[in-house]
């Protein structure tokens, strides 16, 4: 009886990997964070392995000799097994081994099996280069994500990895599946005029900024991530959440719809519509119930005033909360312009306070103090936070300005233009009239006639700093 090696490789890669994954799962019986870590490790590898396959085919590391059941030229069975073996399996089987050792085990496994998969996998002379890059960009980050999730460590780091993984799933894997199922083709962006590409990039950036800012808010204000098994510890009602309840879901739906239009593929746009119905159906009901159970009346009050999918024009503020405070130096030229600009606008839940009156320390930059939980922020980030108290348009500008790379570059420009840090000494306890609440003041102005202690540099330069 003749057995086709081609079929053995394709069937074996799927069933052996699936059985191994199931066996490790039954052995470890992961729950809670261990379950979440294993799933996230697999999620990371879904876009990463597919991208590695495309790079390998283009650079000659290896190629696939297969027909039927393909996703971007990669057999789906090989694709899924690879994602399992580099994702969930090592995360569950070797949770405490050094990651270098885990990578060495995976390398030994591939050295034995990849040449044996010759009927399907054709290895090039430099395939070990691709193997090393795959271990570095697929396996190792997925194991870091799993371990940080299990140990509740490196919140910012695991949030960044989650964003990369889910962005790859949303903008790469899901469109590839939709196009593959519909038997249509990718539209080559090179065929578009430059002005069209520029326009589409800018359009796609709008929902992307909203989604990224929402994740940032979960990390900085909520102490958690968007993953249901790794949620924020605090109810997040600031940033994009002050305008709409589901900014991340809204961002994903709009991104898929725009991507479908860009690719001229209705199936990709339809995936966005399906994601919307799923989010408003079972997922939305389950999430709302969980939030109601965890946060009680605070959640109910928030959900009553903030819509799930249609943003407000003005930010929501909990009744009775004290206003956030923006500390601005009274005797500072550049800062005075910032102070005056905010005083002329109708902000909600924001008070401008002389920096000289800070209760605990001498400030060196404009400083924003949030109304609820969260740490103070300074400089460009403080101004960006204050913009969120105006209206949706200015809030979006603030969200874009707060993104890490953008914030760093903007602060660099400010510092290079004369806005470097400068110490503002504490002078006295402010009189109530020295604090301007922008909740009700439309055209208020801070007038503080009391003397302020200034540094020697202030007296010499008389200029302001952000």
What residues fall within each predicted segment?
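Short pre-active-site segment immediately N-terminal to redox-active cysteine/selenocysteine motifs
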Residues: 330-331
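A short amphipathic helical element positioned immediately N-terminal to and/or at the very start
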Residues: 236-244
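A conserved hydrophobic position in a structured secondary element of the catalytic/binding core
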Residues: 213, 245, 378
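Membrane-anchoring alpha-helices and their flanking helix-loop junctions
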Residues: 1-237, 253-325, 339-340, 345-346, ...
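Loop-to-transmembrane-helix entry motif
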Residues: 244-250
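Short, cysteine/histidine-rich loop/knuckle motifs that typically chelate Zn2+
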Residues: 334
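Structural alpha/beta surface segment adjacent to cysteine/selenocysteine redox centers
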Residues: 341-412, 417
